[in-house]
Amino acid sequence: MTQEVAPPAAAQDDAHGTAEHIAEGVAAETAEHAKGGLPQLNPDTYPTQIFWLAVTFGLLLFLMSKVALPRVAEVLEARQEKIADDLDRAGALKAEADAVIENYERELAEARAKAQKVLSDATLAAESETTQRLGELAADLAERARAAEARIEQARRAALGNIRGVAAETAVAAAAKLAGLDLDPATAEAAVEEALNRVRQEVV
């Protein structure tokens, strides 16, 4: 059977000291909790907290005024300048577009006026040429009608002359053959002319 060996006296002293330290730490923490809980809620630390809060707020305000706010102001100013530039450019483009539209409308009106004038001139020229051609055609037809009437009258007179001669010869021959009369050709022509005049009067 193994015999137990007793621990040395020094080891016993160290273990006793460690236990005392642990007990002191626990007691101190317990006292701290009992004193006020969280440190930031301890009224004894309020002055220090307020001081550092003021310092921190001042630093933040300084940094904002020197760094952040100027940058924001620069951004806003640049944006305002860009908006103003865009508005100016839009106004210039609108004015240019209005000028182009006005020029286009003016040229369109001029083109319409020119086209209307050309059409009117062409219509007048066509009417004048048509009137002239109709006049020339009417004159030509009248001249042809007069020439035809002259030819008809000439043919009628020639036919009447031939009829008078033939009728006179026929009358002389008939009188000599039927009645045994010897008629003078001049007398026969006079009788035929008188008969033709009576026929004309009856026809008229």
Curated annotation (Swiss-Prot):
Origin superkingdom: Bacteria
Subcellular location: Cell inner membrane
Pfam families associated with the record: ATP-synt_B
Entry GO MF terms: proton-transporting ATP synthase activity, rotational mechanism; proton-transporting ATPase activity, rotational mechanism
Any one of the GO CC terms: plasma membrane
Membrane topology: Single-pass membrane protein
Keyword annotations: ATP synthesis, Cell inner membrane, Cell membrane, CF(0), Hydrogen ion transport, Ion transport, Membrane, Transmembrane, Transmembrane helix, Transport
InterPro entries: ATP_synth_b/b'su_bac/chlpt, ATP_synthase_B_chain
Record keyword Cell membrane present: yes
Listed transmembrane segments: 50-70
Assembly and oligomerization: F-type ATPases have 2 components, F(1) - the catalytic core - and F(0) - the membrane proton channel. F(1) has five subunits: alpha(3), beta(3), gamma(1), delta(1), epsilon(1). F(0) has three main subunits: a(1), b(2) and c(10-14). The alpha and beta chains form an alternating ring which encloses part of the gamma chain. F(1) is attached to F(0) by a central stalk formed by the gamma and epsilon chains, while a peripheral stalk is formed by the delta and b chains.
Function of the protein: F(1)F(0) ATP synthase produces ATP from ADP in the presence of a proton or sodium gradient. F-type ATPases consist of two structural domains, F(1) containing the extramembraneous catalytic core and F(0) containing the membrane proton channel, linked together by a central stalk and a peripheral stalk. During catalysis, ATP synthesis in the catalytic domain of F(1) is coupled via a rotary mechanism of the central stalk subunits to proton translocation.
PANTHER family: ATP SYNTHASE SUBUNIT B, ATP SYNTHASE SUBUNIT B', CHLOROPLASTIC
Family classification: Belongs to the ATPase B chain family.
Name the UniProt record assigns to this protein: ATP synthase subunit b 2
Gene name of this polypeptide: atpF2
